[in-house]
Amino acid sequence: MNEIATPQEFSDICPFSDAQFKEKMKELVAEDGFKHAVTWVMPDIDFDGFCKMLLQINTKKEFQENVMFDFLKLLAAKTTEGISYDNIEKVDQNKSYTMMTNHRDIVLDASFLNLALLYNHYRTTEVAIGSNLLIYKWIEDLVRINKSVIVKRDLNIRQALGAAEQLSGYIHFAITQKHESVWIAQRQGRAKDSSDTTQESLIKMLAIKGGKSTIDNLLELNIIRQ
């Protein structure tokens, strides 16, 4: 299935397209920082062989199914006593959703959600991740190869308003046009003291775009709050 082209207005925050995939992967494997990270996490890996395998991959879907799936299973085995979930059968595979959760680890929470989806042969979600975590260009490239959406942080008020409008527009586009689900944390920062409330500014951001009433703009995003 061919990807729907993403409008240029979202080009600096959206996941890389499959048309960009091989070029971006070639740039990534040449980065010293990427080599250091991979060999630190997997010290026994044949890095040159690993890179050769990566360069044979053509799409984000192939990358997630052939590389990230095994990595996430290994990560879950090393960091948890097991992952459990229920009611996944209630998620309609023919619909796209905005999945909102609290989070204690912005990487692991979304990763384990996508691991559950992969186990059940569902499409993975795109993952909204703050730009403050992307301290090197190669890290930003890696997460965008892996279906991440950039949430711009550390902006002045005027810039923040523009970024919120851009992000809202992209999420609406992803859900209604690309038919991709999106995961986003329900509040900025880690959940603390059993606080499980959704940040009001997040709801306002999601409702900016859609061209309808606030309620209808939210309804078209098919929000699942976990």
Regions found by a protein language model. Give the residues of each.
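Membrane-anchoring hydrophobic helices of lipid-metabolizing enzymes
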Residues: 1-97, 103-114, 140, 145-147
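Soluble catalytic domains of membrane acyltransferases
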Residues: 78-226
